[in-house]
Structures are given as structure tokens and as C-alpha cells.
């Protein structure tokens, strides 16, 4: 084997309320049970052969049975930190790296390792030069355990609010982007609304909120969540929706009502929130991670983050 690395390493900060399994297998290091908030850094490698929007993984079809850093996106290390060290070092890095950061909150059916790889892929594909951070709540990482995930995102909301307070206060960034996907939107929106009630001054720390394919009841979103978000945050909020989103269509069937991210029954339009219809540009399996896997959406988010331009100007 060559001594030259054929991958790039992306360090990512994390906060999680999953149980620490202490497993030597880094893909299994944090489990599916609830725990107190923990903090740390993970390094994820992305191969030079990486294609925009992909998270390359071993494929049985290609007779790949183990991870290979020259071909696959994989976790290289996970290091826990105490809270003080975590936020102090984060602020130091942000001061050096363009004073910007994003927080990614994943959705349903996602493991800690999935979330780490996704956060690194978003960082790499968006050519984001600031501090990437992800919050991993105890999703079961299984399509069949939807209702367990629903209960756990509701439980995690309190921890998420406390983390957001520290993150907004202590990261010392000039630009903070908050990004939630799928069911993660339930946690982020509720945590933000509660936090803004308690600490309204923190809204000045937020640059933009991106709600990708929210798995939230569309009527509840329109009536209860969106107006409060617009009023309390008073910063740009972008909603990405799609009519092709299979996970949201399935969720609509489970709940009997459309979801806020599902454009199939009409696009959710709310005063003060910019809605981007991503229908028809989606190529991803299960059609649910289009915000991170479709190059046009990546280009749109990149433009949003780099320029702050609104949709009509992009």
C-alpha cells in the first residue's frame, strides 16, 4: 500500500445524548439509548474519488465487505471532551476560521456514525470553511422504529435547547447557520422557540435557519411553529420541500395528514419563511436526503451561506 493518503480528513464537532457504548468499532461507539449530553470531536475521511452529494460506503454489489478510506467515507477517530474544553477550543477555532459555523440536526433512521459522515460530507461539498457541528439524538437507525424515534426527538428537545444556548453564546461566531433535516426539525424548531422565550437576545447570534424536508404536521407547522419562529428569531428561515420525498409520503400515510416538507399536497407557504420547492431535482435513494445529495440544492445552500442572497436573487 502507498504511504500517500488518498483521502482528506474533515474534523467535525459533535454533541450527543446517545449512550456511549465504549465500543472499539467507531461506527457503534454511540448507541440508540438515551443518555446525558456528551461533547467531542470526530474526524471523518472523504476519499479523493468522492462524488458530490454521495456518502460512499462499502457495497455488497461491488463485493466490498469492509471500509477502505481510499473508497469510502469513514470515521477515523472519536474523542470525547468535557464541556469547558469543547466550547473553549471551538471558540478558538472559529476565531481563526472565518468566524462562521453551522449546526446540523439529523432526522429519523440515522445512527451517530451516519450523522457524522453526513456532517462531514455537507462540510466538504459546500466547501464550508467554518466550524461544522452536529447534534445526534437517539434515533434508532431503523426504518421500522419510527415511533421510537418520534418519542426520542421529543425527549431530546430539552437537551437540544440547552446545547443551543451554549452554542449560540460560547462559539463566538459572527455567522451561525442552523440546519435540521426530517424529524430533526421537530427538535430544532421547538428547542429554538423555547430558547427564544427564555433568552430572546440570542436571536442576534443566528444568521439563518434551514429547515430541510421537515417531518412536522403541515397544519401544525403553519399555525403554531412557523409564526413563532418568524416572530421570535426575526432572521431568514428557508424551508426546502419536495413532492418526491418518499419518507415524507410514508409519514403522511402514518399520520393521515401532510408534512411541512411534503410538496405533494401543495407547497407550504408561510409569511416570513422562504420556501424552495426541490421537487424533480432529487436523485437520492429513498428521496429523503435531497438537501445534501442533489448538486442543485447543494449549490443553492452554498450560495445562501456564501452570499446571504435570498431565493429571488439566486
What are these regions (language model features)?
Residues 1-81, 85-96, 116-175, 192-208, ...:
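Lipolytic serine-hydrolase domain surface
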Residues 110-115:
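Short substrate-entry loop that stabilizes the transition state in hydrolases
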